[in-house]
């Protein structure tokens, strides 16, 4: 039996710091997939946008990450090997 679904493994740490306001999945996750053609597209999916200057924090659920991937790639199966929630901290470098 063959499946048309592609399997992507994701791993996120509990705390992640970013230095730019537009946050993509590639900024906050480690990813692995046997089909290397879809990884670049998944890494560029924007998941957050910080609008204020200074330090800001946001808690991001892995379910929101899976939802964002499925919007663009509905046939991709996601397996989370990391934290269920990720705290993303934006540190404005200006």
Predicted regions and their residues:
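N-terminal, intrinsically disordered, low-complexity segments
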Residues: 1-73
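Extended, hydrophilic extramembrane loops/domains of integral membrane proteins
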Residues: 59-93
